[in-house]
């Protein structure tokens, strides 16, 4: 097993995950472009240009990027103070955060349904008020949102102490800050992997348009409040620290993110799977077994804080660490395999799950119904069903921000707010064009990911990213599907894409 971050693995099994992810990307790109007209009835994207045209544009822009890398070869690194560069980067991200806050101030509004429950629950906790019966029932059914509610209650309380007219705005700024930090961490991963500066600079510009100034920064919900943790776990796993330290800290990151958004655990699962494969292909000795046991112990210790946060938050809001009314993962598997709404939210599914008195009965019934859904379809029907779900997950480069419903709009009348609403709001005159640009950038990212898994499939960093994103896709195919669920791993998509672009540039230089 290699100890270098970009070195090649000796086993044959780890690169197989890259081949699987490459096949999945080709399938998705085919669905999004060639299958758009057949699939758009299941998910309306609202772009002003068809996806196949945007794919050609994305391929052309990527080709131009690679060509510029070839005609302008990397310069020798200039000596510079690492401390000075760190301060310069910090100042840059701080300035961008100020712009993000200005953008959020112009665009924020009150979201409906689950985000509304979290917002009102956090406000009640911060003010020391009891939860209404409506929200108490909600958190007993959906305890997965309890940790975020507790976290946001602390943010709301801080906003109250600062004397803000609407303390909720500080929660919005928190979403912008965590998105900012996730992009900064992705850039740190690329520096750690010694990706050439010219690639990082263009990649940073792409990240700024695609993520830093995405309308998602006004959404203080699970997607934004957990997006830092997977990419931070990735950075930790790529350090030169001892294995127990790396895996223990990565487990801590993923468990804290997983308390807010369970899919954050996927990166940790991928890392453990790759580590197990390398262990099996490595010559066994006493030192290796000892190191493996230390890693296992470190992971167990690392996940405890996240589990404590989750259980403690649920206990605080519902009075029980495991409410009998909780819908559970089996419920989301059931609605994820239901073809009535093609894996989307189902009110009938919630009613069905709520008809059982205990969690064990509900889980058993949900699993039986999920299996029945799959068995009642033919092989061709199942292929069509999962193709629709894959299309729904990957068909929107904005991660379907406009799918969020508005509970109460906040309409600022200044010129900047009016201008930004024309771009980012669904009813805005320029929103279709904005969505087309975001879709083109998203297709560029997917093409870069495809290049990375095909050309760098033996590198550990690529294998870890590919297996994580493959697991994320499997999660979308099996459970409830929403494009916004991909936002959590958007920084990981970015890292993998830039690794692919750099490799394309290197191959062009050799030619």
Each predicted region: which residue ranges?
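Membrane-interface anchor segments at the N-terminal boundary of transmembrane helices
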Residues: 41-55, 170-174, 389-469
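Short hydrophobic/aromatic helix or loop-helix immediately within or flanking a transmembrane segment
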Residues: 137-164, 173-176
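Extracytosolic helix-loop segments that constitute the early lumenal/periplasmic catalytic or substrate-binding loops
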Residues: 116-141, 147, 341-347
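Transmembrane-helix signature of polytopic, membrane-embedded enzymes
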Residues: 186-209, 460-463
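Membrane-proximal stem/loop segments at transmembrane-domain junctions that anchor or position
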Residues: 131-132, 311-415
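Start-transfer (signal-anchor) and selected internal transmembrane alpha helices
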Residues: 1-101, 291-300
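Multi-pass, polyprenyl lipid-linked donor-dependent membrane glycosyltransferases
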Residues: 170-178, 205-237, 260-267, 485-490
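Transmembrane-helix motifs of polytopic, lipid-linked glycan transferases
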Residues: 173-194, 232, 447-451
